Amino acid sequence: MIIDSIEHVMLPTESQVAQLDEAGVDQAVLFTTTPHPERAATATLKDIESEMTVLYKILGATMDVATRSSQMVGIIEEMRRAMDAYPDRFPAAFGPVPLGLDQPHTHEWVERHVLTNGFVGLGEFTPGDDEQMRDIEIVATVSEECGRLPLWVHTFTPVTRRGIRTLGDIARRHPHVPIIFGHGGGYSWMDTVAIVRDHKNAWFDLSAVFSPLSARVAMNEVPERCLFGTDAPYGDPVLSRALIERTSPSDTVTEAVLGTNVQRLLKI
């Protein structure tokens, strides 16, 4: 079975399912989204700018915690509707958690908005800078209290090598909490591969990787903890699958990366 380990909710849902069919992908793990670039009339800067501006505000951490929390409640409902409409295609999802809450309020949020919905992980987390990456520590602690739910953390720009190393330190201090290094660390992919190699609870996400070389090296170093993902609508399922099949060192690794690994991680 081929499972995309990260797709954001796309509208209409029927179009998202059609993309899975085109790529020969059986299932996808869903993540929430605030912007919807797939709704732009054309792929021009003019049409896509408004949706991408929302994304850049999130990545830049310019929203206060209250505003972001309020947004998350609505997009969780949007994701829940997609899962209910196609339970055989979207069998699992990660629930968003605001960064910047203290531990008791983070725990309360996870109980109310993640566990109640049956979501299997926490994220995507998008630290706006290296300092905000430290807030992941609280989430990791809460994860330990709530069944060791995996964390999915964005490690591409604006996160730097320093932020990635901070996340590696958090993985070391919480060895029983799976931490997915989203987008493979971007430009700092070599550091990220080394961290994942040295921490058995760390995982390497192959969506939006820096280059085919980074995918090839990751699958050679940590084939059992690499995850096929598209980050759709920002990535394309057909192209993302082809990247894995082209750069994988063996058919056995290809099978693991395209599905077996995420099945084992999320127990789906």
Language-model features, listed with the residues they occupy:
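Active-site neighborhood of phospho(di)ester-bond hydrolases with catalytic His/Asp-centered motifs
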Residues: I2-S5, V29-T32, F94-G95, G123, ...
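Conserved, mostly hydrophobic/aromatic
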Residues: I6, L20, M79, M83, ...
